[in-house]
């Protein structure tokens, strides 16, 4: 009997202990399962089943899924609010552009493209912007002023030429803008106008700046302007020795205008059949036509204030007014006054009409010097480069001459082109005066001007061999 009594008491104690433990566990589970956001508690989810469900589902993974989504939204907001002056394409810059960017960092001249398209790490290094879906943005200088020339490499030399349609022009600007201004600042040129064919001595030619890159001249060590692509620059143009050393230390491809000319694709039938942009000549129109470039050929303009600017005027672009400062090349007016007496002067620029037309209205309000004006929309867009096809003039090419600081500009009529050194601020420059005797002689001869231009400047000798 004692044994039975003892077993009964032990069994009752065990049952009571189990009930107490179950009550504690159930109470704890109810507290843990209480919803924090006002949700209804799940029914009958206690004990081992509830613990298993908690272990499988849990709340931590849900929080981890929410946090990354929140971080990505913040990142997108930052990217959308980031104001940049250059297009941000999804593709990485090509080899040449990346090298130029490194040189800018070496010289401590990180341009707007670098600063806006890369994030700064805590260690001060730059990394690519993770956002690649932002719409392309264009610069003021790249849309109003003359664009830079794009690298023309063997990889794309067989490409087809574009047209001057609005859609292709926009696409071309997106390509051109990837080079942007810090690239132009790194490239030097050596094109000359000598008669012995030394117009391209060291094959380091600049890729033409958007007219007035908005920086100060190359001759100034502080706030200097970006020299124009393909435009000649004198050895004492103000570049420091450290700058030159950094340039030559890197193994990168420079823009070769004569390689570009050699491999430029032929004009399409549509381009060859474009209607002439100029009206027919009148009886008072001179027999010979002289086509002149604007930027770095006749004038030099900048968005930075120039103390010695000959004039300044505002330009309204995208609801923003920009002040343009203009320097006139020495003997600018004398050259035009003299040449306008024997030539039909035609201004042909790759700049936007909103800028160039306003400048010409100031310089020649009555059109006594320049009879006709052509702008970017009259150029032919070839793989991001604007070329001035003289066929659009509707003039006899045997009596047509073009003067430009960029040989690429007259790539389709090389025998009609006279290269001239780019001008920024040299007050002793007399390149325009030096051309007057030769131009007068061409009119006096009254012959096809192309053989004479070819023999004088020998640009065809600078083309690379086949």
Curated annotation (Swiss-Prot):
Q: Which residues carry this modification: Phosphothreonine?
A: 86
Against InterPro entries, the record matches this protein to:
Dullard_phosphatase, FCP1_dom, HAD-like_sf, HAD_sf, TIM50
GO MF = phosphoprotein phosphatase activity; RNA polymerase II CTD heptapeptide repeat phosphatase activity
| GO CC annotation terms, alphabetical | nucleoplasm
Q: Which CDD domains match?
A: HAD_FCP1-like
PTM sites of type Phosphoserine: 28, 51, 85, 104, 134, 165
Q: Could you mention a single GO BP entry for this protein?
A: positive regulation of protein export from nucleus
- Residues bearing N6-acetyllysine are 26, 57
Class of the enzyme per the UniProt entry, highest EC level: hydrolase
**Coiled-coil segments, which residues?**
none
- Record-listed E.C. numbers: 3.1.3.-
Q: Composition bias, kind Basic and acidic residues: at what positions?
A: 60-79
Would the keyword Phosphoprotein turn up in this protein's UniProt record?
yes
Composition bias, Polar residues: 8-20, 129-140
Tell me the keywords, alphabetical order.
Acetylation, Hydrolase, Phosphoprotein, Protein phosphatase
In this chain, the stretch annotated as Disordered covers 1-140, 220-240
- Report the residue ranges that make up the FCP1 homology domain in this protein: 283-442
UniProt keyword annotation of Iron present:
no
* Known role: Probable phosphatase.
Similarity field = Belongs to the CTDSPL2 family.
Protein name stated in the entry: CTD small phosphatase-like protein 2
Which organism is this entry from? Homo sapiens
């Amino acid at each position: 009997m004692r044994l039975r009594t003892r077993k009964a008491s032990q069994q009752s104690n065990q049952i009571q202990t189990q009930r107490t433990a179950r009550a504690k566990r159930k109470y704890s589970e109810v507290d843990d399962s209480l919803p924090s956001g006002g949700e209804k508690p799940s029914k009958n989810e206690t004990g081992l089943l509830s613990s298993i469900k908690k272990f499988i589902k849990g709340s931590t993974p849900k929080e981890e899924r929410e946090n990354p989504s929140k971080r990505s939204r913040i990142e997108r907001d930052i990217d959308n609010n980031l104001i940049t002056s250059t297009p941000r394409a999804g593709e990485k810059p090509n080899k040449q552009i990346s090298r130029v960017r490194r040189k800018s960092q070496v010289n401590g001249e990180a341009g707007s493209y670098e600063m806006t398209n890369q994030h700064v790490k805590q260690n001060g290094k730059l990394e690519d912007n993770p956002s690649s879906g932002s719409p392309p943005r264009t610069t003021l200088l790249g849309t109003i002023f003359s664009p830079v020339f794009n690298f023309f490499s063997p990889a794309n030399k067989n490409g087809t030429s574009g047209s001057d349609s609005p859609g292709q022009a926009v696409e071309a600007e997106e390509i051109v803008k990837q080079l942007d201004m810090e690239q132009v600042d790194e490239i030097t040129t050596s094109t000359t106008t000598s008669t012995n064919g030394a117009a391209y001595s060291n094959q380091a030619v600049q890729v033409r700046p958007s007219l007035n890159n908005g920086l100060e001249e190359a001759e100034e060590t502080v706030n200097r302007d970006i020299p124009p692509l393909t435009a000649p620059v004198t050895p004492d143009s103000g570049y420091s020795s450290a700058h030159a050393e950094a340039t030559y230390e890197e193994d990168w491809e420079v823009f070769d205008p004569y390689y570009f000319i050699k491999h430029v694709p032929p004009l399409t039938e549509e381009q060859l059949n474009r209607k002439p942009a100029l009206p027919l000549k009148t009886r008072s129109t001179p027999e010979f036509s002289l086509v002149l470039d604007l930027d770095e050929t006749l004038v030099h303009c900048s968005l930075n204030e120039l103390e010695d600017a000959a004039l300044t005027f505002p330009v309204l672009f995208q609801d923003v007014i920009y002040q343009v400062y203009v320097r006139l090349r020495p003997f600018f007016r004398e050259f035009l006054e003299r040449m306008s007496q024997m030539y039909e002067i035609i201004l042909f620029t790759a700049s936007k009409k909103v800028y160039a037309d306003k400048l010409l209205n100031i310089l020649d309000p009555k059109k006594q010097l320049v009879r006709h004006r052509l702008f970017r929309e009259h150029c032919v867009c070839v793989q991001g480069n604007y070329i001035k096809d003289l066929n659009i003039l509707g003039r006899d090419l045997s009596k047509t001459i073009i003067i430009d600081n960029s040989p690429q500009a007259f790539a389709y009529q090389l025998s009609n082109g006279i290269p001239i050194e780019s001008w920024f601020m040299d007050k002793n420059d007399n390149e325009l005066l030096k051309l007057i005797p030769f131009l007068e002689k061409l009119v006096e001869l009254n012959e096809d001007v192309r053989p004479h231009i070819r023999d004088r400047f020998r640009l065809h000798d600078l083309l690379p061999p086949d």
